[in-house]
Amino acid sequence: MNREEQRLAQQTMAFVLAGGRGSRLYELTDRRAKPAMYFGGKSRIIDFPLSNAVNSGIRRIGVATQYKAHSLIRHLQRGWSFFRAERNESLDILPASQQMNDENWYKGTADAVAQNKDIIEGYGPKYIIILAGDHIYKQDYAEMIRHHVESGADVTVGCIEVPRMEASGFGVMKVDTEDRILDFIEKPGDPPAMPGHPDQALASMGIYVFETEYLFKIMEECAAVPGYSHDFGGDIIPTIVRGGKAVAHPFSRSCVRTVNEEAPYWRDVGTVDAFWQANLDLTDFKPALDLYDTEWPIWTYSELTAPAKFIHNEEGRRGSAVSSMVSGGCIISGSSLERCLLFTGVRTHSFSQLNGVVSMPYAIINRNARLTNVVVDRGVVIPQGLVVGEDPALDAQRFRRTDSGVCLITQPMIDKLDM
């Protein structure tokens, strides 16, 4: 980061939209918002945009919460309380609250910002960067802010190339040769292809940079239009594209990579399959996302636990793990793991076999269990002798099984078993 980028970051406030449920994760988000979902053995999803902001030199951050916010708020209080007001630093948790007009829910992404206008203006940032709180990536926001200032844009939109057939869940844009946005379509049924790349589309990452004064001005103008949906992708960005200057910022320009990361990494882990795959990808010999990057750390709350322990060394009862990540507080007692990722405090008991398992914290895998391609929710107690991943029809009756064969197991599902 050069001096100019550092100066711009100090003039910027980050506003993180962290109120979404993530309904395609099904029971995993019954008790927590999607940004509070676990990822990578010890982190939460929200730790990634927050770490990007801190590592980029941004020290004023607001986090808007709404759906099932307790788990998220508790995590932020425990893991992100190191900001010092005397150093002009703060992280404000901004739950939806009753306003003068008696409305108390955020009606959309733009409304979350509008309802906190007084707090934002109280800090007086010249620039504001709007961030989605539910994606996995490493990015230097200071570089994106510099691009915004140098281009003279009214808004700069972070963008990434995605397969066209997967782009209908994003805002999709058309750009000219200088990255000026010519059209912006929110969640199109038939996403337009990129010129020369018929199978690719240019999708919004849900990251926007504005001058703060301009943002509130354009929001007031949009709010006066009948049918206003209080949404950045549905209202604010298309309005600027039509009457102002909107510029696309390719993620490849500001993504953070180590020598071990071959391509820019950005994931929306919004389905059970995507969540399972992205976690297990971290166990690869050369993972696409390098969490061992000490130059760009992912800050989080770290529980005080003992180191992981592996015990027993008998034939058929050997505590072992291959191509796996095992977090602190875990005890692998006479069981075998292959390509697994275990969060804090998981216990696996003798003769159990785990292959392709992602386990949330403090789950217990009892003796003789065999689990293949499974996501285990926090605190689940797997009964002795349970077999999952070998009988698709039976798995589908008892658990949530995806089309690709990944099974999600929660405690209420276990409680219904006749064993």
Swiss-Prot record:
InterPro entries: ADP-Glc_PPase, ADP_Glu_pyroP_CS, GlgC_bac, GlmU/GlgC-like_hexapep, NTP_transferase_dom, Nucleotide-diphossugar_trans, Trimer_LpxA-like_sf. GO terms for molecular function: ATP binding; glucose-1-phosphate adenylyltransferase activity. SUPFAM superfamilies: Nucleotide-diphospho-sugar transferases (SSF53448), Trimeric LpxA-like enzymes (SSF51161). Its EC number is 2.7.7.27. GO terms for biological process: glycogen biosynthetic process. It is an enzyme of class 2 (transferase). Keywords: ATP-binding, Carbohydrate metabolism, Glycogen biosynthesis, Glycogen metabolism, Nucleotide-binding, Nucleotidyltransferase, Transferase. The keyword ATP-binding applies. CDD domains: ADP_Glucose_PP, LbH_G1P_AT_C. Pathway: Glycan biosynthesis; glycogen biosynthesis. It catalyses: alpha-D-glucose 1-phosphate + ATP + H(+) = ADP-alpha-D-glucose + diphosphate. The keyword Nucleotidyltransferase applies. Alpha-D-glucose 1-phosphate binds at Y106, G171, E186, K187, S204. It holds the Pfam family Hexapep_GlmU. HAMAP family: GlgC. Involved in the biosynthesis of ADP-glucose, a building block required for the elongation reactions to produce glycogen. Catalyzes the reaction between ATP and alpha-D-glucose 1-phosphate (G1P) to produce pyrophosphate and ADP-Glc. Belongs to the bacterial/plant glucose-1-phosphate adenylyltransferase family. Homotetramer. This is Glucose-1-phosphate adenylyltransferase. The lineage of its organism: Bacteria, Pseudomonadati, Pseudomonadota, Alphaproteobacteria, Rhodobacterales.
